[in-house]
Amino acid sequence: MENLEIEKTALVVIDLQKGIVAGEHAPYTGKEVVEKASKLVKAFTDKGAFVVLVKVSTIDGKDMLKPKLDSEINQIKRPEGWDSYVPEISNIKNTYAITKRQWGAFYGTDLDLQLRRRGIDTMVLCGISTGIGVDTTAREAFQHGYNQIFVEDAMTARSREEHAYVCKYIFPRLGRIRNTEEILEQL
């Protein structure tokens, strides 16, 4: 395994916020993902790498996408503080925060601008949910020409099947799949 070029690599953490982490997930719990992701955030920031914390938020819901759906599964409950980053990552210095209004972290944000201005060509992705926020961001990153590494054990989904499908059939077409320990060894 080759070492990561820290000056050209960013860690992008998707939706590790209280209202999403608290949900039911598989194959890993929200707590397990936060534990792995927070190790990555600390290691990347200690090395001086660019770390992006992405969250989904809205003031009143009017700026969120509202397509007609056959399912209500996409409805997020928004109790007070639902969009706050989990404490394990919220106070780590030298991270860049992005707020999105949809699944992916590129559309309607300055993520691409921030990465390009720093000369970053590789993204390490983790977070919740494997098949929604992480997958959509990965597809957008692929279209923008970024190399990608997916940290399989630092992400999770609504079901074991969703996570397995995306990791087996989608991510290998967009980048490389590693685990947390492998990434930490590459720093």
From Swiss-Prot:
Q: What is its EC number?
A: 3.-.-.-
**Domain of life (superkingdom):** Bacteria
Q: Which InterPro entries match?
A: Isochorismatase-like_dom, Isochorismatase-like_hydrls, Isochorismatase-like_sf
The record's section on Gene3D superfamilies has: Isochorismatase-like (3.40.50.850)
Sample GO molecular function, one term: hydrolase activity
Q: Which UniProt keywords apply?
A: Hydrolase, Plasmid
Give the UniProt family note.
Belongs to the isochorismatase family.
Q: Which PANTHER family match?
A: ISOCHORISMATASE FAMILY PROTEIN YECD (PTHR43540:SF7), PEROXYUREIDOACRYLATE/UREIDOACRYLATE AMIDOHYDROLASE-RELATED (PTHR43540)
Designated name of the protein? Uncharacterized isochorismatase family protein CA_P0030
